[in-house]
């Protein structure tokens, strides 16, 4: 018999959330402007960058027919533009699905983070870290983390299926493996 476990981690020190004027403009059409997550505490919205003229993208959960979002389980990524070509293409196990680019100004230490999607992970899959790439110029340091799709493994007996992180302003759940049975 398998048991369903959820571990909750409570973070007392709140991490600063980037909002409004601190957000950079979304650089590419495949850059996610927001990440939404549905869980039993509601829908959590993390704005990632702004669309044209500094407008934030949708903070509402979209239907599967929406061409400006990608749904991955209980997470949804919103985009400023139609992403039909990327959305309709499922990733193979060897393709890069997603890149997270962090560019840090050497002069000001200000970070710009962009989340770029290239294809869609199939249902019951997750984004898994594959590798990092680092480069620098006289003005910026740049770190790119690359992710691929991987099918969730089946949980073993007494293995933790999900991990929850609670902060003062958010509650996020990460699925670790596929639970079977009760």
Swiss-Prot record:
Residues annotated as signal peptide: 1-20
Superkingdom to which the source organism belongs: Eukaryota
Free-text description of this protein's post-translational modifications in UniProt: Contains 7 disulfide bonds.
Cellular localisation: Secreted
GO cellular component: extracellular region
Keywords: Disulfide bond, Secreted, Signal, Toxin
Tissue-level expression: Expressed by the venom gland.
Major place of residence: secreted
Keyword Mitochondrion in annotation: no
GO molecular function: toxin activity
Family recorded in the similarity comment: Belongs to the scoloptoxin-11 family.
Protein name: U-scoloptoxin(11)-Sm2a
Record organism: Scolopendra morsitans (Tanzanian blue ringleg centipede)
